[in-house]
Each structure stands twice: as structure tokens, then as C-alpha cells.
Amino acid sequence: NNPTYRVTKESEVPGTIVYQMDDDDLSRILSNIRNARNLGDFVIAAAHIHQSRSILETQHLSTRPPEFYVDLAHQAIDAGADAFVGTGVQTLRGIEIYKGKPIFYGLGEFFREAQWELELMMGNADWSPDRRMQRFARNFGGNTQSLESLVAISHYKDGLLTEVRLYPTELGSDGPDSRLGIPRIAKPDDAQRILERVERLSDEWGTDIDIEGSVGIIRVN
């Protein structure tokens, strides 16, 4: 909460935000994961953050996880987690397979509550449908990227991850107001676009996503 600023070094990208986790917090998180490993058959670690990697990205719509979050995900797997799920951002992020374990840095929102009563209280009931959609998307830009998500299904054989199947969903961006926030399988063209975007976002970790129809498949060797 007390940021410091300095001139970027040669290897750094201007505008990059660097965070430092509290050592005690990190220690407790990893300790709890190790305890869960001893008590459970399958451990999923999750962390809710909004931080972005760059000042150029809005926090809730940051498509690239900051460095400390990637480090946390790796340490969570090393401590015994079978999977790591990032929450907090309202858009999609990339996917990494780390030591044979899936890391989902951001799958988007599975559903969203439409708080129309708040608009009525604030005197915004006369907004046009397009204006309500922009407000509902909460993306400060009017597009519907934050209304697109993924359902990920991981397949295992003999305890080892063999593949992850990705099913694109959307929250009623092109339907009536009554469907806003309700998840449904994305149409083929939308599914293709969503999967291609996630594929690009996953490039930095070398994750290959095969797109077969409206499904993305990550095959783990």
C-alpha cells in the first residue's frame, strides 16, 4: 500500500508493477496446502487477486498475471497442490501446465448477478439496453470480454493429468436482459474466438491448445 517508483532498468518493461508478498502470509498459505496434502486425496489451491502486471491494464480486466502470482502458483504446486485456480479478475487469463499440474490463472466468471435494483435506486431505470449492457459488463470500455468464460475439465489416468478440455461459455451478451449473467455454451464462432484468445495468453508458458470444433484440448505428455 506504499508504492515506490524508479526508473526502469534495461531488461524491464516500462509501466511494469512489481509486488512483494508478505513472508508470513506466504508461509501460512503454503503450510495450509501441505496440511491439506496430508489430509486429502486431491488438493486445489486458489487465490483471489485483482492485481495486474502493468499500469496499462485495468486490475479487474488484467489478462496477464503479475510475477508474484505466478510464483505463488508454482510454490503452491510444489507444496502439494494438484491444481491452482486464480480468481478475482473478471476476464480470461492463460493456462500453464507446471510439473504436470494445471494452473488456471483466470477462467473468467461462471455467472454474474444482475443488480438491476441498484440501478432503480440510483435513478438509472431509463438507461437504454446498450447502456445497461455496458454497465453490466463492468469493463470500462463497453465490450463484452468480461462476459466470456471457460469451463475446464481435467482428465486423469492412474493419478496423472492426461488432458484438459476447455469449454467456452458466455453470460448472455447477445440475448435479452433476462439472460444476463446466466452461463451458456458459447456459439461456434464465439467459442473459436475465445479459445484463440486463451491460446495466445498461454503462449508465455509454452502451453499448446488444440482447437477441435468448439472445444480446446491441452494434451499433457
State the predicted function of each range.
Residues N1-N221:
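Acidic, metal/ion-coordinating pockets
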